[in-house]
Amino acid sequence: MSLTNDQIVEALSAKTVLEIAELVKTLEEKWGVSAAAPVAAAAAGPAAAVEEKTAFDVILVDAGANKINVIKEVRGLTGLGLAEAKALVEAGNKAVKEGATKEDAEKIKKALEAAGAKVTVK
């Protein structure tokens, strides 16, 4: 029995994503191919050169001498409780904010540096 492309599309549309993923694995094993590796490698090269970073992580490197002001600033920026903010500040090299926009990351960096902390944006 030969299926048309429309029949195959209809059959696949009725399946869940997990069922489709399982089907892909089965086909890869049966045919001895890998669907993900060549496609991902080819797509990653050109896209990386053109793509500009849009999400930044603000890392608190060191609280400096004025730890209390830095803890207050971390609490204000993140909404963390006193204990959580203190633990974050004392640990060092921890992310204060992850996935921030460039503007937000710079604002957070300036605020923490004004409080006496050493901060990096990655």
Curated annotation (Swiss-Prot):
UniProt record similarity statement: Belongs to the bacterial ribosomal protein bL12 family.
TM ranges: none
Organism of provenance: Bdellovibrio bacteriovorus (strain ATCC 15356 / DSM 50701 / NCIMB 9529 / HD100)
Protein name (Swiss-Prot/TrEMBL): Large ribosomal subunit protein bL12
A single BP term in Gene Ontology: translation
Gene name tied to this protein: rplL
InterPro entries reported in the protein's UniProt record: Ribosomal_bL12, Ribosomal_bL12_C, Ribosomal_bL12_C/ClpS-like, Ribosomal_bL12_oligo, Ribosomal_bL12_oligo_N_sf
SS bond list: none
Function: Forms part of the ribosomal stalk which helps the ribosome interact with GTP-bound translation factors. Is thus essential for accurate translation.
GO annotation, cellular component aspect: cytosolic large ribosomal subunit
Pfam families: Ribosomal_L12, Ribosomal_L12_N
